[in-house]
Amino acid sequence: MKVEITQAEKVVTVTIEGRLDTVTSPELEKELAPFFAEQGVELIMDCTAMEYISSAGLRVVLTAHKTITAKGGSFTIRNINKEVRSVFDMTGFSRILKIE
């Protein structure tokens, strides 16, 4: 997995490439941790190049969503492929998260 983070003021875009699974999810969590302490962050997760997400990856996504929204921020997932979308749908995450 490759993670690229860009920030402009309070807008943080996280681009994920590859697989978000048990092996790679701790890396993403570490990359996101600095933004968990900030108030009013608008986090956008661009999943255009994400190939797969496991339950460990879903946990990181849900933790990020809960932490950021609890501090007055927003969390949006964009550009997921059909396979990743089906995982979000089957787990009910698509009802919890903002997916564009």
Regions found by a protein language model. Give the residues of each.
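Short beta-strand/loop segment at the start of cytosolic alpha/beta domains
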Residues: 1-15
